[in-house]
Each structure stands twice: as C-alpha cells, then as structure tokens.
Amino acid sequence: MDRRTLLSAGGAFAFAGGASSAQADVSSLRGPYIDLTTGRGNMIARARIDGNLDESKIKYGTGTGVVSGVRPGEAVRELFGFEIFSAARLRRQSEDAFQLLHREVVYYTDLKSGEIINDFHNPYLDEWVKVVDIVNDPWDEKIEAYYPDPPSYGGLIKPPSGPKRPYILNWKSAPGGVLCAMQQIDLYYPATLKPDKWPRESAGPMNQVTEIYTFFVNAADMQNPAKTSLVCNGTWSRVTPWLPWMLMGQAPGHILYSATTASFDDLNLAKRNVVDYTLKHYPQMMTPPGAWSDTSLSSLEMYAREQKPAPLKSKP
C-alpha cells in the first residue's frame, strides 16, 4: 500500500509513461543540480520525495481517501474512508542506490465522522465484519538509478529477467512552477489467501492489482541542492480484490482506493487523530526501522499470517 517499491517492467509488471520524458520540455528537466532525463537524477529526486538526504532526519507520509466497492451491473459505492501514515529514513548505499527504511499503517474511517473504525456493516452482505488495520512493519524499499527488482511477497513474485532499465519518470512542467509525474504499476500474481482455506476471505487464486501515483513538486526546490528533502503532494489509487475482512469471497467485483497524499519533514503536519491512534496502538510505527529487512509483505500476505479463516456463514 502506498509508498510501494518501484517495480521493474517485464512479466506481470507494466508502467504507464515510465520513461516518456520526451513528452515534456526537456530543457525544463535538466537543471544545475539534477537531470530528470537520467536514471541518477530521478533516483535523487525520488529519494528526496520519499526521504531526506540528511540521514539523521525522518520523512513522514500521509494520505486521506475513500474506499469504494465496484460490482458489475450497479453504480460504484463509497464504503468507508481511510488514512495512511508512514515514517521513513534514507541510507545511502552507493552512487546509484539508496535504501529507504520505512514503516506504514492504514486505518479505515467512517465516511461521515472521519473516526477510525474497528467494525463495519457490509451492505453487500447485510453483516457486521471486523475491520483489520494495515500494519506494514517494515515496508523497506530500494531507490536506485535503475528500476529495482520487485518485492517477492514471500516468493510469490519472481524477479523479471533481462537488462535493467534506467529509472526515469515521465516528468513534465505544469503551471505555477510545478513539476509533475505519474506512474502506474500493474500486478498479477498468485494469492496467498487460497479459496479452499479462506473461502470467505479469498477473492480467488490470483491477485490482480493496479496502483497509480501522481507527484507534484516545486520545480525550484527540485534544483536546489540545499533542499535535502522535498515536500510532495500527489494522489494514489489502487484497484485490488475485495478486502479479506469484508468476507466477500469470490463474489464478482473489486475494491477501489483513491486518495490525496503528501510527504514532509514536520510531524505536526500529520493529522493529530491519526498520530494519536498510532501512538496508542502501534507506537513502533512512529519511527522507521533501525536496519534493512528483505522481508516486505503486502497487507494480503500479512493477513494470511496473522488472521484465521472466518467460519462459513450458516444458510437460512
């Protein structure tokens, strides 16, 4: 969820506009500090968006949005809101690579009050279900001059073959001295939640997931070497199977996340209720991990590890 590892193309992975910087005015992307038409320039830019080149400092990420249900033959339905909070720190590995030590939580909220919820009345089932928070501890990433290999999700995804591609986003200039870019990640991989063991939680034998990011950054800040960290506003959308705790089983349809996002250095810019809830329930998530971990599982894989299959619903 969210700040996800930037996956390489090939096999089950595809990018929309990943390297189409020719669409932009190239002169606006080549500056005195970094060149956004190169892999190394994009690496430095992304490191300053998701982290801070000053490794003593923490970078925070937030998101606020809505989760909607999509079923054939009817209008999309807003179900509940959600809040994202993350904490990250950079570690420089080489001229062409950073590690991003990163933790992330996602809470679900009531659409009207905005309060974090622990249960939800599923209108599709007319049934109350227990809400399960997303706690990605850790979700470490590599930020490199080349597209890194994807996370394995415990061996479910195999690394692509072939030569590495330079990590170049489709940056372009926008009115108001802003640079913007978009990235799309498309995944199709075996599900950990198998229907035979998880009949109410599993949407099927395969996970079909798409994530779409947009980034908006001040162009002058991008070329200012004194700015070791960049304030970034953007959006994040995710198409994903029914959330397992909704107990939809293999019913036709899927979930759509849509959110506005931000990254910044000042914790005071995060929502107070989200920070307070994190301090109370997951205090370790307020700071990044102290060391790199190769084990970064998605929320679906974590659900399989931490939850138990719900009992089958009795027939009337």
Language-model segment annotations:
Residues 1-25:
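N-terminal export signals
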Residues 14-15, 21-22, 43, 118, ...:
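Intrinsically disordered, low-complexity, compositionally biased regions/tails
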Residues 25-104, 109, 298-315:
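N-terminal segment immediately downstream of the Sec signal-peptide cleavage site
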Residues 59-66, 88, 105-107, 208-218, ...:
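Generic hydrophobic, helix-prone segments enriched in Leu/Val/Ile
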Residues 71-221:
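Predominantly extracellular/secreted and cell-surface proteins with exposed
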Residues 232-316:
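Edge beta-strand at a domain terminus
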